[in-house]
Amino acid sequence: MRHALGSARRAGAALVAALTWAALLAGCSSVGSGGLDLDRILGKPPAPEDAIRITPDDGGRDVRPGTRLRVQVPGGHLEKVRVTRSQDAQDYPVPGRISADGLTWKPDHERLALAARYTVDAVALDSHGRRSARHTTFTTLVPDERFIAYVTPENRSVVGTGMIVSLSFSREIADRAAVERAVHVTARPPVDVRPHWFGASRLDFRPQRYWKPGTEVSVELRLRDVQGAPGVYGLQYKRFGFTVGRSQVSLVDAAKHTMEVRRDGELLATVPVTAGAPKHPTYNGKMVVMDMLEVTRMNSRTVGFGGEYDIPDVPHAMKLTGSGTYLHGNYWAPDAPGRVNVSHGCVGLRDVKGGSSGTPAGWFFDRSLIGDVVEVVNSKDKTVAPDNGLGGWNLNWQEWTAGSAVD
């Protein structure tokens, strides 16, 4: 599903009500195949690219530094804009301002940085008072004959015990062994941390078991002048680190419509949930919270479902896979959690429009960290792929260590 705004770094039975929710196959942004008209209930939102226009385009690569960065709306006004530049595992806010008429945001300094990833999160109100959110990313030009690594997690962050160190390279790596030898991941207290390649442009690191709470992890990139491919050399020589916070592992039972939340091994709560409907089941397996968004737009077209739904203000969204699985608040099917699975593959918790810390979704969001583990069992789908998000915990240790390029 489509995610947008407010990255928070700190994540079958027939139902009879005013509406027949059993007719609703509510996707990661629940909408129905049985005739339920969410457009009528929620108000028809404009298409994401029409409601909030962002340049450079979402997903852009090798964007040149002279390209103009703008956030614009055709009507109504921009409510909030946050732009972040990420380099060497460090996030830097990009200062800027919204124009007096509320229609345009532009940065204080026009020139984009080289070899950086930019993230744009924007929220706007249209002329009818409907709120929309949009999230886009793009990467800027890396000089010819150089490569860099985009790093997860963020430097100096506090993360959950399931965090996997993930390096995404700007160019395909031919000499994987040379690059692997140039990356050093160490922990205090000491633990064996091993690498695994997913294709030619991604290298992940993890221990055999989840990190112990309190572990301090250091990552050193000694990539400068390392030849990753013929004539292509590394640009970075950086060190960054993160700290593992408390342990929180949540078990979603899709058949029971429940989620058990365990903090440091003790049961904290059992929360009612709604998982993927029979036609769109939720992945089984271990998933790691990759991002946390206070509000997001979820649009079925972004994940191959056609025009089945488009909800502009999904609250408390926690990204679990790169393909678009989220755990999020659900205010449009309030009777579903604990009773029936109605989504297009996400896990939904009861919430209210606009989100509230007093709802199950808000309660869970406020107690979660990026890097927390959410495991799904008893769904009708396959196990999530290990390279879909931070899914590497679904490989056993022998499978994981076999992914090293160094003998």
Question: Where do the protein language model's features map onto the residues?
Answer:
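Acidic, low-complexity Ser/Thr/Gly/Pro-rich repeat segments typical of extracellular/periplasmic
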Residues: 2-25, 29-246, 273, 404
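Short, charged beta-turn/beta-strand-edge "cap" motif at the junction between a beta-strand
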Residues: 124-126, 223-225, 265, 295, ...
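Exported/periplasmic cell-wall-interacting domains
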Residues: 161, 300-407
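Gly/Pro-biased beta-strand-loop elements
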Residues: 231-338
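Soluble periplasmic/extracytoplasmic beta-strand elements of cell-envelope proteins
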Residues: 53, 70-72, 119, 166-168, ...
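Extracytoplasmic/periplasmic, Sec-exported soluble proteins
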Residues: 61, 110-113, 157, 161, ...
